[in-house]
């Protein structure tokens, strides 16, 4: 880390890009008029989980900003009382940006409820201009991680059109 707290961690080829976990209990105040999880609350939790993964990957949250949330989708309604486990992993790296895939699953039954992709950008604390993060991806550890990386690349390709 430099004097501004900016991340300069470089991952070796054999280092796995870790999956980070956060949890939320769906309470009454998290519900919409259908008595299921309000989409805006779910989006906030998704971005929060992505930011946790981003900060952990960079070993600091300084200089990391959310650029956008993409392809957030619900596979089924989330009911009050559900224990949601958010699993987040860096799946794409550019020079100053990187993407984090986040999945929200039922902590007790492992049922997938929500997934989405978040793009983060690293910036200089003083100038607020983009700054390289120096993160690199290792080889995927399993088929699921490979599929997540391919989804990120497809999303990038779609956005370039």
Label the model's feature ranges.
Residues 30-45:
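A conserved, well-ordered hydrophobic junction motif at loop->secondary-structure transitions
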Residues 16-28:
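Short amphipathic
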Residues 26-28, 74, 120-122:
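Hydrophobic residues in beta-strands and at strand termini
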Residues 44-48, 52:
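Short, residue-level hotspots on alpha-helical faces of the histone-fold
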Residues 37, 51-87, 91-98, 111-117:
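Hydrophobic beta-strand-centered segment that forms part of the acyl-chain substrate-binding groove
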Residues 16, 79-80, 91-161:
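HotDog/MaoC-like acyl-thioester-processing domains
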């Amino acid at each position: 880390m430099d004097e501004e707290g900016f991340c300069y961690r470089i991952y070796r080829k054999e280092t796995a890009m870790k999956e980070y976990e956060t949890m939320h209990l769906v309470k009454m105040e998290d519900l919409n008029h259908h008595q299921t999880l309000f989409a805006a609350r779910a989006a906030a939790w998704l971005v929060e989980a992505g930011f946790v993964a981003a900060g952990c990957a960079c070993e600091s949250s300084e200089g990391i900003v959310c650029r956008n949330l993409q392809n957030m989708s619900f596979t089924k309604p989330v009911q009050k009382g559900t224990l949601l486990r958010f699993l987040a992993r860096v799946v794409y790296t550019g020079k100053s940006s990187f993407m984090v895939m986040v999945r929200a699953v039922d902590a007790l039954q492992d049922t997938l409820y929500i997934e989405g992709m978040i793009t983060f950008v690293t910036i200089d604390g003083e100038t607020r201009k983009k700054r390289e993060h120096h993160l690199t991806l290792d080889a995927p550890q399993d088929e699921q991680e490979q599929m997540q990386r391919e989804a990120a690349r497809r999303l990038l390709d779609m956005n370039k059109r």
